[in-house]
Amino acid sequence: MKTQRLGLVVWMVTGRLALAQAPAPVDRDLLAKIRSEAMDRSDVAPVFDMLTVTIGPRLTASPAHKRAAEWVRDRLASYGLENSHLEPWHFGRGWTLEKLTVEMIEPRYLPLIGYADGWSASTSGEIVATPVFIGGKSPQDIAALSTQLKGAIAMTDPIMTNFVRKDRPQPSEPEYVPLSAAYATGIGQPRPNTPAPAQRMAQALREAGAGVILKPSRGEHGTVFVTGRDLGPGAVPSITLSAEQYNMIAQMLQHNIPVKMRVNVQTRFYDSDGGNAYNVIAELPGTDPGVRDETVMIGGHLDSWHTGVG
C-alpha cells in the first residue's frame, strides 16, 4: 500500500513539472519572416563594407571615427529606430597618420613592414641615417650617447627571440586554444600601460633629441601588433617594425655591416571637438504594454586601432 501511495505522489509531482515546463507555442510564421529578413534582405554586407572598406580604420576620437559615428546614426534612423543621436564623452586628442616612409636603403633596398604607433608625433621631415642600436641600454647609457642620438633613428629594444611558442594549431585540432583562453595566458595580449623603466627610457630619448624610435612588434606567428598612446608635446616619434626585419637590421649593425635607412612620419592631432569621442545611441521601443518600459541593451565596438579596420 505504501509503495502504491509513493508511486502516486511521484507521478503527481513529475506530471505537474512536465505540465509546468511545457514549451510555449512556436510562431512559425514569425520565425519565417525573421529568416527571410536575414537571408533575403540583409543589410550586413553594405554596412560592413562602408565601415571597414570605405571609412577604414576608426581610431577613437579621429575624424574617421566621427564620420563612422555620423553614418551609423543616420543609418539607424533610416531603419526606423527612434532618437538616433551621438552622445559625446571626453577622450583626449584625436590623431591620424598622414604619411609614413620606413625603408632600408643600404646595403640593399628593402621596404620595411612597419606602422607608426598611435598618437605618434611627426618627424622633422625625412630622416636618412644609420640607425643607432641601443637595445638593452639603460637611461644612463642613453644620456651618455646623447651626441650620437640627436636627430637619430634609435632602435630601442633588444633583439627579439620569442616568435612562436609552438606550431600554431588549427581550430579543428584538439589542442586548439580559443581566443579567450589565449588572452588569459597572455598570448598575443596588448602591452600593459607603459611601465616605469620604459617611461624613463622615453624621457631619456626625448632629452637626447632622438629623431625617431624603432621597436619590434610583440605579435607572435608573424603578426605585427601596434597600439600607442598620447605621450604629450615633445614626444619622440615612434614606429613598430615587424620583429623579423627589426632583428635583421639589429644583427647587421652588431656585425658592423653598414646600414642606412630612410624614415618619415607625418601625423596630425585634433582638438576640434574639445577632446570628445562619440557613442551612437538609438532606440527601438517595445510594443508589449507589460514590458515596454524595460530596457534591453545591445552594443558593440565602433572604433578600431589605426592599423586595422575592425
Sequence positions of predicted segments:
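Sec/Tat-exported extracytoplasmic proteins
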Residues: 38, 52-59, 72, 76-83, ...
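Short, solvent-exposed loop/turn and secondary-structure capping segments
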Residues: 62-63, 143-146, 164-170, 217, ...
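Soluble metallo-hydrolase cores and metallopeptidase-like ectodomains found primarily
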Residues: 29-30, 114, 119-144, 228-309
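Noncatalytic luminal/extracellular "stalk/propeptide" segments of secretory-pathway proteins
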Residues: 22-27, 49, 53-182
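N-terminal capping segment at the start of a domain
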Residues: 25-62, 225-229, 303
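Sec-dependent N-terminal signal peptides of Gram-negative exported proteins
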Residues: 2-20
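Extracytoplasmic/secreted envelope proteins and their assembly/folding machinery
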Residues: 28-31, 44-48, 52, 56, ...
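Structural recognition of the beta-strand scaffold that forms the well-ordered cores
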Residues: 47-52, 85-86, 153-157, 211-216, ...
